[in-house]
């Protein structure tokens, strides 16, 4: 089934101890769409400026990504620059230029309005809610990402939007901030009262955790000798997770657990190079091979 994603397409300038790139295509919706397209067709809604060329858009071609929802506006594309510390865990933002993204008002093409799987990437909660209103009927699965900025600045708007989604996908610090609870399991109980029935906590180098009424499932981060750039890891994880679910067409506990593995697989490939360099050349057989390696990471007998 087709998977709708609404979020940012951007240009990034990235620097880490492993090198730097001055201008590369990025943005949450970009990483998500590329990762998800390995499993299911993706419908993309985002905005770019006049400086976003045909060659920049090439990342979406040949990947079952429909870009009819990619709006082009007068002005420049959203730009972000950041530098990572030696261990890649700390990030300094060097520049944020919203440009045309500041006026982004998502409008779904008619053919997108019947999407059964919806992912609302990190944009203002009122815009996320407006997207859901444009979808005809209740999606089979709606998931949402947010950040500390919206938790702090628009808490009421965020709470209202959370009432309409099934899955909340955020990192551990955002989970604690949203719930006012340090323990992640207790935090999940608070968040369930806000609307979502499933919480997926992205924990960086410590992996990811899924909590729902059936229990807890944790996956480790895949061990890598030389990770280069964590910028798109979380969005690639989300893309792998949601893409697998859309492709599987069922939401059983076993399917959700496998989706966690495939999300972690896509996130691990993303960090191997700068920007989208690794996902650009990634093959499906590599994904499935790494998924099998994931299974062996914690396999043991009692």
Regions found by a protein language model. Name each.
Residues 1-4:
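Extreme N-terminal starter segment of soluble prokaryotic enzymes
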Residues 34, 80-83, 207-211:
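Short beta-strand scaffold segments in enzyme catalytic cores
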Residues 136-140, 148-218:
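Conserved phosphate/ATP/ADP-binding segment of small-molecule kinases
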Residues 184-302:
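Conserved phosphate-binding/catalytic region of the ribokinase-like
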